[in-house]
């Protein structure tokens, strides 16, 4: 039976008044005596206390919490020989350094086909404990009383689960920033590692960090030129990716942002899932910093180790640009000086965003804010939906919006850009509409009676004569729905709006007075007053950007889009 199910099973048996007997065949291990050489923060002490109360369980906390140092304290307190399981050589090197620093012990290693284990505290790469190209587990030299699984969300993979279940250690703990899996297989993690014993919210983590958190949306004009033989619907996602990574205008935008970051004394990390993309950007950034380093995870273990050592040896006084694949830098990439992240390749999942953001979340002398440049390809529907999911992640992570063109807004208290949830946006959005003097442009994929009535009441009855009001919506798919849509369009037009129907429209966007942009996944004005949001609606988010430059650029692109296509 998976160890993580023991408590739940016992509770079930007790509630049924069923008798039971436990045969405990766990390994207690060999006693060790290592002193902990550091002092934990209050949050780390709370985490350690919970772990000591339980033989198994998970510490869930983001990068910068200090999961490694907390685990080192746990090793000292448990006083039993320990094996630490990691996924990569980069993580192995980090753990070697941490064990030496916090426990004053040089740990053994099992990696690259070489077993240099001590039987006291050892670190092993998961793949080194199984036969080549097989899930068959190799014979082990030592038995351990405690196993610590770093990045334990990987336990849901069969090979790692199979390995984790092969240990009979009395104590088994998992460490992760993202216990919830995109594929929904987190139960496997809990079966092998136990329940979550301690977790920190993003807001709690932010309090532990000595810097502010900002994301900067950069709206890209990337799109396909009209092609009578191909439509957006029958293009493959890979064809989009192939065109995106070689789009010169987009790459120039990214390169300029990176160069400006370096000029401002920042240290950027550029992440893409395509090596070809990184190589193109590397050429664009040649001589833009004292050190421009491309890390992809390719090469032998020795080559990768040498590359990391070179990166770690760069003095903090020297300018640095790092380009890396998301897979390589997503875990175990420890460069505390990094303060700027360029997300230059589209992705959707919030867990991936949390991992990538974590690369910036280590305290470092002189780091007072971290910035994430997110390149929003809003003209490609599939990429736009990916961005909408990332936006939800930024809000959960406690990030604030920042735009380059803040000068015009800086002196106005009510002009700050912000991320809103569905429950939060209504008051400020309706106030922006009610105060419109010059123009309102609204993109609504679907019209409802509530939206139509709200828009007429808030805007069309109050906006000054001569103001421009445009509403764009998606053409109804059926004749019945078209009839309903036409009736609502007629109401809007009779009230003074110009309405245009489009064959394709996915964006939910509002541009007010050519200076305020609302953009996200919220279906504006769709809910009646005193409406209780559904669980799905509660997930939706939108951003308010107070920037004439950004608002006018997006409006020009979106209004003119139909004419191009």
Question: Which residue stretches match the model-derived regions?
Answer:
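Walker A/P-loop
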Residues: 54-75
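Conserved SF2 helicase motif VI
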Residues: 61, 179, 348-372
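Conserved Walker A/P-loop ATP-binding site and its immediately adjacent core
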Residues: 68-101, 273-278
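Conserved helicase ATPase core of P-loop NTP-dependent helicases/translocases
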Residues: 93, 108-110, 114-117, 279-280, ...
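Post-DEXD/H (motif II) to motif III coupling segment of the RecA-like Helicase ATP-binding lobe
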Residues: 145-146, 153-216, 394
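Conserved interdomain hinge at the start of the Helicase C-terminal
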Residues: 232-273, 279-284
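Signature of lipid phosphatidyltransferase scaffolds
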Residues: 387-392, 396-413, 516-565
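Primarily the HKD phosphodiesterase
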Residues: 432-494
């Amino acid at each position: 039976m998976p160890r993580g199910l023991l408590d739940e099973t016992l509770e079930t048996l007790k509630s049924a008044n069923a008798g039971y007997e436990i045969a405990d065949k766990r390994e207690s291990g060999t006693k060790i005596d290592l002193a902990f050489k550091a002092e934990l923060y209050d949050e780390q002490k709370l985490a350690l206390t919970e772990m000591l109360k339980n033989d198994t369980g998970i510490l869930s906390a983001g990068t910068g919490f200090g999961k490694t140092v907390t685990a080192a304290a746990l090793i000292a307190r448990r006083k039993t020989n320990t094996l630490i399981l990691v996924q990569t050589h980069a993580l192995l090197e980090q753990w070697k350094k941490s064990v030496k620093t916090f426990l004053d012990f040089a740990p053994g290693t099992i990696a690259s086909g070489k077993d240099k284990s001590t039987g006291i505290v050892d670190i092993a790469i998961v793949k080194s404990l199984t036969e080549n190209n097989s899930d068959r587990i190799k014979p082990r030299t030592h038995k351990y009383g405690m196993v610590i699984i770093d990045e334990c969300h990987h336990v849901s993979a069969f090979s790692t689960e199979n390995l984790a279940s092969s240990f009979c250690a009395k104590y088994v703990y998992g460490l992760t920033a993202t216990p919830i899996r995109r594929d929904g297989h987190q139960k496997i993690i809990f079966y092998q590692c136990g329940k979550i014993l301690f977790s920190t919210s993003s807001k709690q983590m932010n309090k532990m960090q000595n810097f502010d958190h900002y994301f900067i949306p950069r709206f890209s004009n990337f799109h396909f030129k009209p092609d009578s033989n191909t439509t957006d619907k029958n293009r493959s996602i890979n064809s989009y990716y192939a065109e995106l990574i070689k789009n010169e205008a987009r790459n120039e935008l990214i390169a300029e942002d990176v160069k400006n970051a370096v000029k401002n004394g920042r240290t950027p990390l550029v992440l893409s899932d395509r090596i070809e993309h990184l190589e193109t950007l590397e050429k664009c950034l040649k001589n833009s910093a004292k050190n421009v380093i491309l890390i992809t995870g390719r090469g032998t273990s020795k080559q990768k180790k040498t590359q990391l050592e070179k990166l770690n040896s760069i003095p903090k006084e020297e300018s640095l640009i790092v380009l890396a694949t998301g897979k390589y830098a997503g875990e175990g990439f420890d460069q505390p000086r990094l303060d700027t992240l360029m997300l230059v390749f589209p992705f959707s999942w919030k867990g991936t965003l949390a991992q990538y953001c974590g690369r910036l979340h280590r305290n470092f002398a002189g780091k007072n804010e971290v910035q994430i440049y997110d390149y929003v390809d809003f003209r490609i529907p599939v990429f736009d939906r990916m961005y909408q999911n990332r936006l939800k992640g930024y809000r959960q992570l406690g990030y604030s919006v920042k735009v380059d063109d803040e000068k015009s807004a800086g002196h106005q208290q009510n002009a700050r850009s912000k991320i809103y949830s569905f429950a939060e946006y209504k008051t400020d959005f309706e106030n922006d509409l009610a105060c419109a003097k010059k123009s309102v442009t609204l993109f609504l994929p679907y019209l409802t009676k509530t939206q139509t009535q709200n828009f007429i009441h808030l805007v069309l009855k109050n906006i000054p004569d001569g103001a421009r009001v445009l509403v764009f919506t998606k053409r109804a798919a059926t004749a019945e729905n078209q009839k309903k849509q036409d009736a609502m369009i007629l109401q809007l037009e009779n009230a003074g709006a110009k309405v245009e129907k489009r064959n394709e429209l996915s964006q939910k966007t509002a541009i007010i007075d050519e200076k305020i942009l609302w953009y996200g996944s919220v279906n504006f004005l769709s809910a009646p007053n005193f409406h209780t949001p559904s669980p799905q609606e509660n997930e939706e988010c939108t951003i308010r950007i107070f920037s004439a430059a950004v608002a006018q650029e997006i409006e020009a692109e979106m209004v003119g889009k139909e004419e191009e296509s």
